[in-house]
A protein has these predicted regions:
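Short beta-strand elements in bilobed, periplasmic/extracellular small-molecule ligand-binding domains
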Residues: 64-75, 170, 174-196
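Alpha-helical recognition/docking segments in bacterial nutrient-uptake
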Residues: 33-140, 206-207, 221
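Periplasmic-binding protein-like
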Residues: 37, 87-94, 151-154, 188, ...
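Hydrophobic alpha-helical segments within soluble ligand-binding/sensing domains
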Residues: 127-153, 195-204, 223, 262-266
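N-terminal helix-turn-helix DNA-binding module of bacterial transcription factors
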Residues: 1-32
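An alpha-beta-alpha
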Residues: 138-180
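Flexible loop/turn connectors
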Residues: 201-266
Length: 266
């Protein structure tokens, strides 16, 4: 059954409502339970280039939305980020920060959590993701497909003060390869977490004239760049060489061929 209201009927309703001084009730919404600041160490452009941190932030924001928690978001590159975070109930620092920055941020608010890095200060809560199981499953999957030489292309994160954060996936990669007797010597290259870096690293490996039978990339964006470099040089995927990504981003389903990828524990 379809119910419809004619224009004439609507006008009558509005007229009566006006006579009765009817005021439409506003939807009652409860005030936010608290206000959380999210400080990102990377720029919006970097977030687009590497979805790893985007997925983390999205998870935080989804949780806050469901639990009526207000969010204020700022970047470490913003000149006024300290002022922005001065009146929040707590802070989540997303990414990598120097010891001086950690000390400064803790002085702003002692209710603070650092996500994706380990902080030595026992008074500060930090959460570092464990990639070991995901990487182990990926390499064993390639092994079961018959691959005995596998390359690794990943990224290195570096702060302004020169502090370097190596890719945590690499140690697990070499450990599992050693366990399975998979060769990787000469097939490890690290640069940045971006599509252009993936293209650059894969091109460098191709130029050496000797390729492994499979490539494990530390992110989907790196893998997509690597796929383009391979295809431009006449290699067919997966007939000539297999490529596996990491992060399970939506973009991985739109490559040609679709990218095999690992779901990151984000």
């Amino acid at each position: 059954t379809t119910l419809s209201t004619s224009l004439e009927t609507k006008q009558k309703i509005f007229a009566v409502a006006k006579e009765l001084n009817y005021v439409k009730k506003k939807r009652v919404t409860s005030a936010p339970s608290c206000r959380i600041g999210i400080l990102q160490w990377f720029s919006s452009k970097q977030e687009i280039e590497d979805n790893y941190y985007f997925l983390m932030r999205q998870g935080i924001e989804d949780y806050c939305s469901k639990n009526n928690i207000s969010i204020v978001r700022t970047f470490k590159t913003d000149n006024d980020y300290q002022n922005v975070l001065s009146d929040v109930d707590g802070i989540i620092c997303l990414g990598k920060f120097s010891k001086q920055e950690i000390k400064l941020l803790h002085s702003l608010n002692n209710k603070i959590v650092f996500l994706d890095m380990t902080v030595e200060n026992i008074e500060i809560t930090s959460v570092s993701l464990d990639f070991r199981q995901a990487v182990s499953d990926a390499i064993k999957y390639l092994y079961d497909l018959g691959h005995r030489t596998v390359g690794f292309i990943g990224g290195i994160e570096q702060l302004e003060d020169g502090t370097i954060f190596p890719d945590k996936r690499l140690n697990t990669f070499t450990d599992i390869c050693d366990e399975l007797n998979i060769k990787y010597d000469g097939f490890i290259i690290q640069d940045k977490f971006s599509t252009s870096s993936g293209y650059k690293m894969m091109s460098e490996m191709i130029s050496k004239g000797n390729l492994p039978t499979a490539i494990f990339a530390a992110s989907d964006h790196i893998a997509i760049g690597a796929m383009r470099a391979l295809q431009e040089n006449g290699y067919k995927i997966p007939e000539d060489i297999s490529v596996m990504g990491f992060d399970n981003t939506e973009l991985s389903g739109y490559t040609n061929p679709p990218l095999t990828t690992v779901n990151a524990p984000v």
